Amino acid sequence: MSYDPADLPPRTGSNLPEMSVGDLARALKRTVEDAYGYVRVRGEISQPKRHSSGHVYLRLKDETAVLEAVCWKGVAARLSVRPEEGMEVVCTGRLTTYPGRSQYQLVIETMELAGEGALLKMLEERKRRLAAEGLFAPERKKPLPFLPEVIGVVTSPTGAVIRDILHRLADRFPRHVLLWPVAVQGEGAADQVARAIAGFNAIAPGGPVPRPDLIIVARGGGSLEDLMPFNEEAVVRAAAASAIPLISAVGHETDTTLIDFASDRRAPTPTAAAEMAVPVRTELLAQVLDDGRRLHQCLSRAIDTRRSHVEGLGRGLGDPRALLEGCIQRLDDRAERLELSLRTGLERRHAAVQQLGIRLRHPREVIGLAAARADAAGRALRAGFDRAVTVEQGRFHRVADRLSPLPLRRQIDAGRDRLDALPPRLAQAHARRLDQAGQRLVALGQLLESYSYKGVLERGFVLVADAEGRPVTRAADTAPGQPVALRFADGTVGAVVDGAAPGASPAARTRAGKAKADQGSLF
């Protein structure tokens, strides 16, 4: 016969002590912590969540149960594995309860992947996700510089890796190396490597610290767990975002990490990375010397070919001196004709100036005529004023006879005043008119002087006359032994012609017209 405990009558007056909810929760907490203490739990991570405070909350589950877990901020920063959804891990920590929600939970202190298979599965899933974002795309790869001036190396400062890289660079082509020391395994290694890559990219060109032209991220061989920092997402993203070309040299040739897919070039070993970074200096020198010899041979052959071609063309050309002789003769002929033309033009213009000087009046004559005209104009003006005064006086007298004496007298007095003022004004106007006429006469005299032959003589020319005083204007009008007179600006001297132009014949001589007395004769 079965029974239900609910069918039993309630116990009253029991000896069980009465407990509050808090007391019971604290008792359960002590019981659980005392009974289990540290435990090691294997399970699959579910719903991992990193709080803004830095703490990580997650669940560990298997086919039958779920266990709440928490990883405090200080421990989460030191974990060798970043918690991800679906990752199978083994966690070590303390089992405790959380009275606020009446649940028990695991306080994680260490976390590791549950076997290499689970680790590889996680890496493959991460690789697919990052590849889907395009971080491994071939078009993102940057070419390596042929000969970098500065090489940045991200590795441990105490390992054999940095010594191998420096030794190999010294053997091939010594370069300036900047070492950014980092931890290459263990807690915090991934963050240090990512910060080192970003730090090299943050160096400004031209600053006190030279900016690398190439970055090498290197580490020696190790187990899969040892190489895990180079599989971390932060390192992969830093390598993909690097503006400086990057070579990954992590592990041995058989080791592959996710940074190898994001880097611009993968080297199987750190030594191979140094070989990729720089060429062999001796090989370059040999190649340069060989190229120099080949270039010299090429230039020599080209020069010989061009020389032969030019010599062949030269043989087909005539003598350049023969080409120039005709040009020289034509040039001499043109020069002789130009000289003759200039001389003839100068003589023609000289004769024209002399004729103009003969036809011009003397300035004193022009000034006298202008003064006479001015005097006549003044006399006519005075006579006109006198006539006008007489006419007005007559009009005044006639009007005076018709008007009363007093107004007429006033008008007469005013008219007399105006009439008295007219002679001074007339004299002033006459004087101004004479001054203006005198100024014009002076200007005309200066103009006449500029056209006179005397001005020509003062500029250094000479007037030639024969014994009878007639001007000699052509060389053909002279004969050897003929006496001539040479008139300068300050006087006249005698001279005798010592020769005549070849082939010149005396031309018909014309008697110059008699110059006016006021202008003065040339002789």
From Swiss-Prot:
One of its GO terms (cellular component) is exodeoxyribonuclease VII complex. GO terms for biological process: DNA catabolic process. Residues 502-523 are annotated as: Disordered. The keyword Ribosomal protein does not apply. GO terms for molecular function: exodeoxyribonuclease VII activity; nucleic acid binding. Belongs to the XseA family. Its EC number is 3.1.11.6. Keywords: Cytoplasm, Exonuclease, Hydrolase, Nuclease. Bidirectionally degrades single-stranded DNA into large acid-insoluble oligonucleotides, which are then degraded further into small acid-soluble oligonucleotides. It catalyses: Exonucleolytic cleavage in either 5'- to 3'- or 3'- to 5'-direction to yield nucleoside 5'-phosphates. It is found in: Cytoplasm. The gene is xseA. It comes from the Bacteria. Heterooligomer composed of large and small subunits. Coiled coil: none annotated. This is Exodeoxyribonuclease 7 large subunit. InterPro entries: Exonuc_VII_L (IPR003753), Exonuc_VII_lsu_C (IPR020579), OB-fold_nuc-bd_dom (IPR025824). NCBIfam families: xseA.
